[in-house]
């Protein structure tokens, strides 16, 4: 309580709380909840970044080509074109970016590549399981063929264990590049995979002959 004189000389009492109201404190448990919520959001953010930059399994293709049996990928010995073989999981959303990057690559090299798509389907299903937007888009790519790949056997013969993986063969049937053609999961844009393949087809020395693959495991 504060006492002050008025102009008339009388003494007036002033309530300080009325002049400066007391600030209400935030309950400690609300502060803890806010901190925990912030930590959770930060953790999820960094987890998504880590997931997007985590490559799937991949191995080099055999130098002599795949073992011959009905599921194997075979090349025509008379082919004078470079060939790109891609492993595709038709239900993998990350593969959309790989298909888009492939189409960008084909524009860069004036469609000098023939393409073969090994489209995965589980062993207990028929080839209808492959139907969908991704397979439909693949069917519209020029100079391309689609092969049903039961349980991913043909892809794995070439070391491809992740959707979006590619192997590029020169006209003599020798594998010259293997890996992915995106910089991370579901990411489109300039990347070393597309750049390296493009340089190979121009007769230049690429910076890499292998890159990480980002996509769903077959």
Please give the residue ranges for each predicted region:
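N-terminal targeting signals for export/organelle localization
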Residues: 1-70
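A short beta-strand-turn-helix
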Residues: 60-82, 101-107
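Short active-site neighborhood of thiol/selenol oxidoreductases, capturing the structured segment around
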Residues: 77-102, 112, 116, 197
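Cofactor-binding loop segments of dinucleotide-utilizing enzymes, especially the Rossmann-like FAD-
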Residues: 89, 118-122, 171
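The canonical Cys-X-X-Cys-His
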Residues: 92-95, 166, 216
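Structural microenvironment flanking redox-active thiols in thiol-disulfide oxidoreductases
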Residues: 96-138, 148-157
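Short, internal strand/loop/helix patches
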Residues: 134-170, 175-176
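Thiol-/selenol-based redox modules, centered on thioredoxin-like
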Residues: 168-170, 175-176, 180-218
């Amino acid at each position: 309580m504060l006492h002050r004189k008025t102009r008339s000389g009388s003494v007036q009492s002033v309530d300080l709380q009325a002049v400066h109201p007391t600030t209400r404190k935030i309950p400690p448990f609300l502060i803890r909840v806010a901190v925990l919520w912030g930590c959770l959001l930060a953790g999820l953010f960094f987890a998504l970044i880590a997931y997007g930059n985590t490559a799937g399994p991949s191995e080099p293709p055999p130098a002599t080509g795949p073992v011959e049996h009905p599921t194997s990928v075979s090349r025509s010995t008379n082919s004078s074109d470079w060939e790109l073989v891609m492993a595709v999981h038709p239900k993998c959303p990350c593969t959309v970016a790989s298909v888009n990057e492939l189409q960008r690559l084909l524009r860069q090299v004036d469609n000098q590549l023939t393409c073969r798509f090994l489209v995965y389907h589980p062993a207990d299903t028929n080839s209808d399981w492959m139907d969908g937007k991704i397979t439909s888009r693949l069917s519209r790519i020029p100079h391309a063929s689609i092969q049903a790949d039961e349980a991913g056997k043909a892809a794995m013969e070439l070391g491809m264990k992740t959707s979006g993986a590619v192997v590029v063969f020169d006209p003599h049937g020798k594998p010259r590049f293997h890996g992915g053609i995106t910089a991370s999961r579901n990411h489109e844009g300039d990347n070393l995979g597309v750049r390296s393949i493009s340089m190979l087809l121009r007769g230049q020395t690429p910076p890499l002959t292998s890159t990480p693959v980002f996509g769903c495991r077959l």
